[in-house]
């Protein structure tokens, strides 16, 4: 895959986001993808082995505006399959001409109100949400961030996927254990909550205060002077160590030396160092909010970050009980084992491969015919019953009112977009359908694959004629049998028996919407290893009963006009009334979603 990665801002490689960018880029590179990175000056050397779109590092205001309104017009989007914005809670584009995944790490500004100046708070609370919503897919790095995206930025739930961060395992080193409590974070007040940690240390029993040192590596950030001033005036100031920024190479020794890792941040999108400490076997205590409570559940001692007393009690409980230390150490190692940067990269790639739009709560694939065929091939190889559907504007109009049909579509293994109506509706809602993946165009492609196919549906005689014409294609597929959709030639039981005896791979069901989806759904357990696909009027076209539109009409996406010409009485209501109704419903849906 040719992937465009926005790697700004990189924060000189000294923040949690810079770790995320560095490790995801490395994992995608190891998977063999062709990467082009957008970088500012501070990231150019780090990523010089890649093709770069390099931009000058500017102050925050100009960087935000340049990324929004200039950079998107500098990019040759046609060179790439898709784009990942690795820090979309910091920088976004005003337009996304190709499928774009926007990764949002946290919305801490809603939980730490004085985190930034007024301009940045306006940018984060008003500008970013508008442009992030335009991205085709949004990734939250934790369920906590996902909840915030829904509550504060009003992102539709169906647009959000949770792809957890990984972490880089800390190598084990032989070193002597020290009586030290560790907290690795940039020194940022009030967000990182160093002040309450210092106060909590002061509340520890005297013997613990004398025995332990509180070590706090991290670069100075906004508000650091407040933390340093308090520490300098504390009666425990000799027990506090601020080491400054620590390179990754020095982390193994720090973790190995520590008796306790404490993470009192007021809010975190993820909290990488918590997993690093768990992997290293260090007993952990952390805040009970945001992603920290999510990661620390049942594996760390939790506390309220706003209460120095609770933080002190948590530290005391762990430091005073060696058995509890061993228990937390074992649980932490087990939790950390489930996270890796390779899994993060795979999760991002899976979002692209299965990219979907949602209209009226119905999910459908927005990729290409080739990718749709690959999905079908994977299902056939699995040798178990699967349900695939096609949807167009008419289908979505039915799903708008028919909850049972809508649920069936949600339960399908795959749903493909057929027709210009679904494409227009998706575009109105901020999605991009790349190709018209319709059953009629797909049929000859399936016929050229080594499948065993059964034709089921249509009026008496239609399936038989379609079978003759399908066999005349002389493709690799074996068209093994057929039955009409009125059960005149064969009963349901006879059809089920025939499907089993003929070892059918793909069952094409042509009964019309929603009848065919309801039939497949209610009989899925009787279909053995068949992949059942609802194909509407396909057999009418294959049999020659109804002609297809000329190629020029198909290329212009107006095949529906030809169908209306051929069957005006049957299709007048569907197209002349149904299409405007569909557009109106999509418009109302968009208004409700953006409230």
Predicted segments, located by residue:
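Carbohydrate transferase catalytic cores enriched for Leloir-type hexosyltransferases
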Residues: 1-355
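Proline-aspartate-enriched helix->loop->beta-strand connector
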Residues: 80, 503-508, 513
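C-terminal amphipathic helix plus adjacent low-complexity
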Residues: 346, 350-365, 588-595
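A transmembrane-helix-recognition feature enriched in membrane-embedded lipid enzymes
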Residues: 421-428, 548-595
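Conserved beta-alpha
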Residues: 423-498, 502
